[in-house]
Amino acid sequence: MGFMGEITRALISVSDKRGVVEFARRLQDFGVEILSTGGTAKALMADGVAVQEVGDYTGFPELLEGRLKTLHPKIHGGLLAKRDDSSHTRQMAEYGIPAIDLLCVNLYPFAETIASADCTLEEAMENIDIGGPTMLRAAAKNWEGVTVLVDPDDYAAVLQEMEQSYGGVGASTRFRLATKVFAHTARYDGAIANYLSSLGPDGNRTTFPQTLSLQFKKAQDLRYGENPHQAAAFYRDGSGGGLADAHQLQGKELSYNNIGDGDAAVALVMEFAEPACCVVKHGNPCGVAVGPDLLGAYQRAWAGDPISAFGGIVACNRPLDAQTAELISDQFIEMVLAPAILPDARPILAKRKNLRVLAFDDGRAWRRTGWDYKRVRGGLLVQNFDQAMEAETDWKVVSERAPTVQEARDLAFVWRVGKYVRSNAIVYGREGQTVGIGAGQMSRVDAARCGVAKALELGFDLHGAALASDAFFPFRDGIDAAAAAGVKAIIQPGGSIRDEEVIASANEHGIAMVFTGVRHFRHG
């Protein structure tokens, strides 16, 4: 049988054929006998790899259009048998079952199949792998005697270890690979369960499945959570994109709060087509601005509230240039994020060794997909992400006076920002810059007053400014407070039982008011 971990026979059957030919060829160089199935066998033989097909090995042909290939005692006995158990080895000899020391399998692309909008139930069912998961689980259960691979990215490490250990693979590697297999098959079965339980009586998919299986992979441990006494870690969901795939170029390790604030900051600036910057602190934007270039946008975003911005998170939706980097390096910032950091900006930022600098390859692809989750005691709240953003053509002018062209631009700007401010949220802005933000207040009029107070504290003149409210005004008092500060245009969802009273207040003050019909609450 050979010592534990020694590989003399391997079974390879993969749908993802990346690197499999070279992997099999290298195994053969170690004297490993290769068993294979169907398309994998053809691919290997076409490249000169000597292969014994599973049907010839078991003496049993593939049946049922390939549905039955590897479900055979000679396969599963070779994977499950304990190499150091005399009763197992005796039965293997009695029934002619050689040991299979390495299994390389990945599964039918079920998740990719159901991702297609026109996928039928029949197509989905045909892409449920049966033999693959069965072999993987058998091999992983018997990790002490079998090396099992489910990910092409592990081929190189296994080959390197075989080179260093005369054709064997160590116990710690086998255990790690087996653990990876069970995570993989759990995710695979979870996707199947989610899909099937989302089908309604008519066979069409409902929005939410009756049962929900989730799996995340740990990206890193964090020093602590929201507070130092809380333990924390960061997990990936495998969907790609976002901070999970951003590249940290320098600085201290990311904290729990860095990740949360960074996600909010990038999502905000990616709402804008023109160059945009924002500074986020404790989940709320302090200042946001757009402009013809990144430098101007950053200068105006910082000026939106330089006191609150101290120690904040900066996000940009354009590659970070040297001029903007110079400004950032002169201010106390925890982290800066951009689609790329231009070469001449890097040495400037490097002077601030603790400054966390992250680049994400394609900023325009920063669009939240899937579902948004919120843990509550005893359960999980699930909803679609708030991807809505109402265009000017969707607005309804409800005041006697329609907004001017410039006021409409300002309204569109503050409306986008308001979506990312915690409720109750009021945003004041002018010419692509926030000049006062009232966030997280229990009453809307208090949010309006907070925004005015912040603007006055910073020396901004609100005469002619635009205001956005994330939800309707329940009373006219918020309109009156805004008018007293000089606001001349307001955008809000509408829908209050006192809308007529609110509109009357706008008309009394000569304010242009539009309704969007869509609320954008954000509760953190």
Curated annotation (Swiss-Prot):
List the PROSITE patterns: MGS
> Could you tell me which pathway this protein works in?
Purine metabolism; IMP biosynthesis via de novo pathway; 5-formamido-1-(5-phospho-D-ribosyl)imidazole-4-carboxamide from 5-amino-1-(5-phospho-D-ribosyl)imidazole-4-carboxamide (10-formyl THF route): step 1/1; Purine metabolism; IMP biosynthesis via de novo pathway; IMP from 5-formamido-1-(5-phospho-D-ribosyl)imidazole-4-carboxamide: step 1/1
Official protein name in the record: Bifunctional purine biosynthesis protein PurH
- Key words, A-Z: Hydrolase, Multifunctional enzyme, Purine biosynthesis, Transferase
UniProt keyword Chloroplast, yes or no: no
MGS-like domain residues are 1-150
Q: Which PANTHER family match?
A: BIFUNCTIONAL PURINE BIOSYNTHESIS PROTEIN ATIC (PTHR11692:SF0), BIFUNCTIONAL PURINE BIOSYNTHESIS PROTEIN PURH (PTHR11692)
Q: In the Enzyme Commission scheme, what number(s) does this protein have?
A: 2.1.2.3, 3.5.4.10
Domain of life, per the record?
A: Bacteria
Among the GO molecular function terms of this UniProt record, one is:
IMP cyclohydrolase activity
Which lineage is the organism of this entry classified under, starting from the top rank? Bacteria, Pseudomonadati, Pseudomonadota, Acidithiobacillia, Acidithiobacillales
Q: Which family does it belong to?
A: Belongs to the PurH family.
- Biological process GO terms, please? 'de novo' IMP biosynthetic process
